[in-house]
């Protein structure tokens, strides 16, 4: 596979070298040069590495000079077309061509009496050089190229005679459309405030276009240009409103909405105009008063009900409604009067689109105050005298105004109910988390206290434990058990110390005050009894050796209010029921191994091993094991252990601090320069996958030892210094 790729790459390089030689030695043959340029364009389009290689062998600069110096128009057109395609394919070629000299040459082509095709190719090259390139946006303004583009925008086609069936008119329209697209990239992506300020001088001409022609071929480019020039620039938005642009857009939107009932294309085109209106009022909600004169809200609601629109188009309409009603009570009332609020609630409850739901919530939030005012009475509605008279006239014409008020109350109640449900869910979630955390802390403190009392009375517990014939495994709450599952070493002692029955009696007698203080903990245990019963029944028999019905008895006795009485009654019933079962004789075997292995031959080594392997240690032997573990832990920390001089036959695990001591120094990696193929792989990978360095590393055959961070550093280095090819 690699040999085939290498062979194709070599063939591509050979072809480009031959084609470049053909361009150089066929200066008198315009047709041959055109064919060679078209072939170069085709090769560069098929192989992304071809553009890089063509730039390296000097072909890019030769074609640039050829476009300027050739006497044949067809060669100039082909050369510009090839330059644009190569720059569009490779960002480094774009940066190489992005010079003031080339912009001046392109400006001369556009200003001179050149044919339509040459001007189109010149505009195409400008479009490619400016797109996603702030340097290109600056040069297109400083060289005066944007001035020539503005003049072409005004004069290429006539506003009154637009017959696209005519071949000459259609070619002029194609040039005008390319100019619109180029102006769009001059002002946006990235946003350029200075170019936006310059292009706003074209707004009056754009308004004339919208007034005289409502065909999609004109409205779509004009709306794209206006929307991108207005975007995120409040000064330009104010200027657009001052020259009557918002009024013109409103009139066009009204006409398209009226036509949308008959043609689907009008509905789609109305959405395009709606997006442009939204771009104008998004940062200045007060401009919504202009839209209220044309009752745009009612038109948008009617357009929203159009069945042919998808969710994205409906979202644009709803977002525009939100900006219209954000700071304009007239539009809010218009929305309410045209049953817009029920429509928003229906969209909120039925739609599964998250963005659509957010837009509907935005509209409902804007209309909350006006809904409250209308739900009270007409007299309390705070409009001036003229507006009050208007409302009275409306009430005369509409006999069902009371029905509107009733709907307003219902809608307001529904909004408050939705908000209240959301707040209650949030409060319940926070209370649940607080209860869980407080319960876990209380239970852990209780176990620590009980464990300390149990160790202090170890000898007494041993005497009492020997007089009884069974052991009862106590249960733990969900919080402690989850901790025991995740960290066995930390919870080893509490699990072992929870076995003896009489230890529970002693703890109940001497910790009565503690149980009373922890009554809230007992209540939490009562709430999780069902979970504990299931959890205990599924646990390992090696740890829990009590019968299954113990959990049932506990559940029945939990309602007792006194914690001490609760614990005593449960233990008494468990002891009586347990001694009566046949398993009593079997449970006698579950005793401390240190107590029942007296007759066996034991020494210091096997006795310690026997105690550590026993899950049922008595208090005395448990204290012995803990003391031995502490002693051995201190021994491991001593100087002898750190020097790896071990007195025990078994090798223990190295201490954690040993790995952090400065010992060996990591071996430095051998430097490997990036080859040409690796650089090509890197560019191709970034183009296809973006900045996902791991994916690029595994997708291409880089040298052994390459890492993702190497690719990232190399790409950023090439971006800043394109001349560095391999380092």
Swiss-Prot record:
Compartments where found: Chromosome, Telomere; Nucleus inner membrane
Coiled coil start-end: 398-446
The Myb-like domain, residue ranges: 666-719
Self-association and partners: Component of the MAJIN-TERB1-TERB2 complex, composed of MAJIN, TERB1 and TERB2. Interacts with TERF1, STAG3 and SUN1. Interacts (via Myb-like domain) with the cohesin complex; probably mediated via interaction with STAG3.
Reported modifications of this chain: Phosphorylated by CDK. Phosphorylation by CDK takes place in late prophase when the cap exchange is prominent. is important for the stabilization of telomere attachment but dispenable for the cap exchange.
Positions carrying Phosphothreonine: 648
SUPFAM superfamilies linked: ARM repeat (SSF48371), Homeodomain-like (SSF46689)
Assigned GO CC terms: chromosome, telomeric region; nuclear inner membrane; shelterin complex
Record lineage: Eukaryota, Metazoa, Chordata, Craniata, Vertebrata
Effect upon mutating residue 79 to V: In SPGF60; uncertain significance
Start and end residues of each stretch annotated as Disordered: 457-493
Region of interest (Interaction with TERF1), ranges: 523-662
ARM repeats mapped onto the chain: 101-144, 339-382
A Pfam family annotated for this UniProt entry: Myb_DNA-binding
Protein name: Telomere repeats-binding bouquet formation protein 1
Gene Ontology biological process terms in this record: double-strand break repair involved in meiotic recombination; homologous chromosome pairing at meiosis; meiotic attachment of telomere to nuclear envelope; meiotic telomere clustering
């Amino acid at each position: 596979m690699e040999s085939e790729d290498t062979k194709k790459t070599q063939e591509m390089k050979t072809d480009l070298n031959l084609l470049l030689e053909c361009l150089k030695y066929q200066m008198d043959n315009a047709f041959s040069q055109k064919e060679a340029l078209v072939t170069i364009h085709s090769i560069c389009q098929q192989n992304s590495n071809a553009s890089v290689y063509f730039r390296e062998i000097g072909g890019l600069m030769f074609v640039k000079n050829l476009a300027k110096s050739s006497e044949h128009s067809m060669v100039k057109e082909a050369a510009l077309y090839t330059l644009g395609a190569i720059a569009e394919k490779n960002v480094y070629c774009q940066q190489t061509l992005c010079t003031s000299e080339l912009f001046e040459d392109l400006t001369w082509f556009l200003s001179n009496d050149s044919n339509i095709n040459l001007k189109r190719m010149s505009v195409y090259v400008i479009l490619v050089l400016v797109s996603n390139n702030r340097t290109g946006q600056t040069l297109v303004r400083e060289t005066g190229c944007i001035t020539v583009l503005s003049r072409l925008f005004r004069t290429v086609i006539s506003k009154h005679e637009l017959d696209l069936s005519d071949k000459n008119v259609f070619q002029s329209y194609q040039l005008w459309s390319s100019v619109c697209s180029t102006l769009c990239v001059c002002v946006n992506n990235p946003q350029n405030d200075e170019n936006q300020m310059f292009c706003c001088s074209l707004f009056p001409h754009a308004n004339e276009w919208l007034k005289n022609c409502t065909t999609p071929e004109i409205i779509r480019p004009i709306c794209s240009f206006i929307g991108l020039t207005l975007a995120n620039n409040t000064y330009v938005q104010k200027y657009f409103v001052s020259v009557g642009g918002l009024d013109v857009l409103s009139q066009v939107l009204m006409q398209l909405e009226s036509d949308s009932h008959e043609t689907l294309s009008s509905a789609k085109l109305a959405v395009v105009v709606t997006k442009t209106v939204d771009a104008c009022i998004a940062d200045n909600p007060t401009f919504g008063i202009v839209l209220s004169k044309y009752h745009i809200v009612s038109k948008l609601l009617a357009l929203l009900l159009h069945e042919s629109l998808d969710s994205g188009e409906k979202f644009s309409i709803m977002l525009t409604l939100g900006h219209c009603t954000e700071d304009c009570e007239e539009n809010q009332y218009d929305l309410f009067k045209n049953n817009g609020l029920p429509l928003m609630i229906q969209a909120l409850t039925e739609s599964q689109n998250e963005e659509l739901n957010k837009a509907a919530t935005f509209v409902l939030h804007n209309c909350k105050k006006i809904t409250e005012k209308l739900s009270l009475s007409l007299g309390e509605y705070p409009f001036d005298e003229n507006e009050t008279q208007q409302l009275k006239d409306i009430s005369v014409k509409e006999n069902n105004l009371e029905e509107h008020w009733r709907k307003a109350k219902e809608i307001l109640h529904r909004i408050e109910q939705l908000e209240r449900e959301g707040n209650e869910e949030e409060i319940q979630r926070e209370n649940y988390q607080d209860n869980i955390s407080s319960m876990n802390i209380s239970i852990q403190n209780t176990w620590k206290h009980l464990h300390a009392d149990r160790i202090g009375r170890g000898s007494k517990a041993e005497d009492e434990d020997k007089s009884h014939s069974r052991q009862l495994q106590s249960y733990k709450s969900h919080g402690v058990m989850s901790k025991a599952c995740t960290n066995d070493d930390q919870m080893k002692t509490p699990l072992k110390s929870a076995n003896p029955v009489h230890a529970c009696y002693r703890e109940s007698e001497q910790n009565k005050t503690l149980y009373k203080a922890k009554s809230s903990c007992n209540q939490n245990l009562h709430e999780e009894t069902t979970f504990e019963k299931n959890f205990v029944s599924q646990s390992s028999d090696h740890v829990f050796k009590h019968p299954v019905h113990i959990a049932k008895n506990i559940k029945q006795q939990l309602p007792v209010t006194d914690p001490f009485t609760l614990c005593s009654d449960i233990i008494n019933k468990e002891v009586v029921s347990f001694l009566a079962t046949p398993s009593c004789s079997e449970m006698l075997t579950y005793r401390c191994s240190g107590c029942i292995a007296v007759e066996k031959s034991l020494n210091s080594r096997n006795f310690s091993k026997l105690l550590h392997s026993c899950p049922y240690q008595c208090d005395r032997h448990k204290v012995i094991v803990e003391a031995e573990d502490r002693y051995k832990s201190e021994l491991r920390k001593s100087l002898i252990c750190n020097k790896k001089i071990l007195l025990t036959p078994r090798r223990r695990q190295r201490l954690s601090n040993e790995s952090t001591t400065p010992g060996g120094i990591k071996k430095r990696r051998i430097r490997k320069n990036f080859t040409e193929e690796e650089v090509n792989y890197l560019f191709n990978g970034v183009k296809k996958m973006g900045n996902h360095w791991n994916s690029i590393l595994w997708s291409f055959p880089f040298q052994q030892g390459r890492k993702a961070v190497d690719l990232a550093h190399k790409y950023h280095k090439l971006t800043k210094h394109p001349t560095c090819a391999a380092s």
